[in-house]
């Protein structure tokens, strides 16, 4: 396995809060996958700030992932096709669905993700990995 790509994103929590307020909550439904949306609602019910911070980290994760795989936010990379969930230990991991899952599987791409947030910002770093021949073909190098 070799590094296919890396991506990072920094989201301003207040900007995410403003968009959520302006859209009457529709922003969360547009951006979050079903499992993420459940966590968002649960966290927001306990604390508005925790809900907004969660949304900011997930928005940031999708942006960083789209950069790591080199597609940006273009098909098959869509907001809801990628979810960042947490293992019981708290470790974040990504789950792709639909066309994105097929695209990743066809290339053997896997990813590692880390997310962090403070009061004002959420940051994500993603490392996408793929078999050596896929990375070599992408970079134009001979196998």
UniProtKB/Swiss-Prot annotation:
Keywords: Cytoplasm, Fatty acid biosynthesis, Fatty acid metabolism, Lipid biosynthesis, Lipid metabolism, Magnesium, Metal-binding, Transferase. GO terms for molecular function: holo-[acyl-carrier-protein] synthase activity; magnesium ion binding. Its cofactor is Mg(2+). Transfers the 4'-phosphopantetheine moiety from coenzyme A to a Ser of acyl-carrier-protein. It catalyses: apo-[ACP] + CoA = holo-[ACP] + adenosine 3',5'-bisphosphate + H(+). The gene is acpS. Belongs to the P-Pant transferase superfamily. AcpS family. Mg(2+) binds at residues 9, 63. This is Holo-[acyl-carrier-protein] synthase. NCBIfam families: acpS, pantethn_trn. The keyword Glycosyltransferase does not apply. It is found in: Cytoplasm. Gene3D superfamilies: 4'-phosphopantetheinyl transferase domain. One of its GO terms (cellular component) is cytoplasm. Its main location: cytoplasm. Its EC number is 2.7.8.7. It comes from the Bacteria. GO terms for biological process: fatty acid biosynthetic process.
């Amino acid at each position: 396995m070799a590094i296919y790509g890396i991506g990072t994103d920094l989201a301003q929590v207040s900007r995410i809060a403003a968009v959520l307020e302006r859209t009457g909550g529709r922003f969360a439904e547009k951006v979050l996958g079903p499992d993420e949306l459940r966590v968002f609602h649960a966290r927001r019910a306990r604390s508005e700030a925790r809900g907004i911070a969660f949304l900011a980290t997930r928005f940031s994760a999708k942006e960083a992932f789209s950069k790591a795989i080199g597609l940006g936010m273009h098909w098959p990379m869509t907001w809801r096709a990628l979810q960042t969930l947490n293992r019981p230990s708290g470790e974040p991991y990504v789950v792709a669905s639909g066309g994105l899952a097929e695209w990743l599987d066809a290339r053997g791409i896997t990813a590692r993700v880390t997310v962090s947030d403070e009061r004002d910002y959420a940051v994500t770093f993603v490392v996408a990995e793929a078999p050596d021949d896929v990375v070599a073909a992408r970079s134009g190098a001979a196998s």
